[in-house]
């Protein structure tokens, strides 16, 4: 960067005072300060963006290396399983696929279904009554109509 010492800054200030004048110098100094601040923030933003992109590239490389390692492990497991399958078929005289049909693929994940109705029905009635759980649902309008005082009829 530019090497600015106190003597150079004082010289620049004196020249600016002579050229610009004492009336406009404070306004110019504020403007220069705000512009330098904006430039500094812009440079910091650019640095942060460059650092983020570099980290993103590093993460991508790391992800690729982990995926490659996972593929290598999967391939080694498959080759080991196929070698075991061959040796098993040689010793027993039959393949495991003949003995267990339909079990070649991995089992599919099924999301366990929540049994909230069963849990709700398992709560005792005395507990529901004491804790204030409503057992009979009623709409808001029906509740208002039920508890609204009836107008007295004049004959």
UniProtKB/Swiss-Prot annotation:
Residues 81-103, 131-155 are annotated as: Disordered. Coiled coil: none annotated. It is found in: Cell inner membrane. Residues 89-98 have a biased composition (Polar residues). Keywords: Cell inner membrane, Cell membrane, Membrane, Protein transport, Translocation, Transmembrane, Transmembrane helix, Transport. The keyword Transmembrane applies. One of its GO terms (biological process) is protein transport by the Tat complex. It holds the Pfam family TatA_B_E. It is a single-pass membrane protein. Gene3D superfamilies: 1.20.5.3310. GO terms for molecular function: protein transmembrane transporter activity. It comes from the Bacteria. One of its GO terms (cellular component) is TAT protein transport complex. Its main location: membrane. InterPro entries: TatA/B/E (IPR003369), TatB (IPR018448). The chain crosses the membrane at residues 1-21. Part of the twin-arginine translocation (Tat) system that transports large folded proteins containing a characteristic twin-arginine motif in their signal peptide across membranes. Together with TatC, TatB is part of a receptor directly interacting with Tat signal peptides. TatB may form an oligomeric binding site that transiently accommodates folded Tat precursor proteins before their translocation. Belongs to the TatB family. The Tat system comprises two distinct complexes: a TatABC complex, containing multiple copies of TatA, TatB and TatC subunits, and a separate TatA complex, containing only TatA subunits. Substrates initially bind to the TatABC complex, which probably triggers association of the separate TatA complex to form the active translocon. This is Sec-independent protein translocase protein TatB. The lineage of its organism: Bacteria, Pseudomonadati, Pseudomonadota, Betaproteobacteria, Burkholderiales. The gene is tatB.
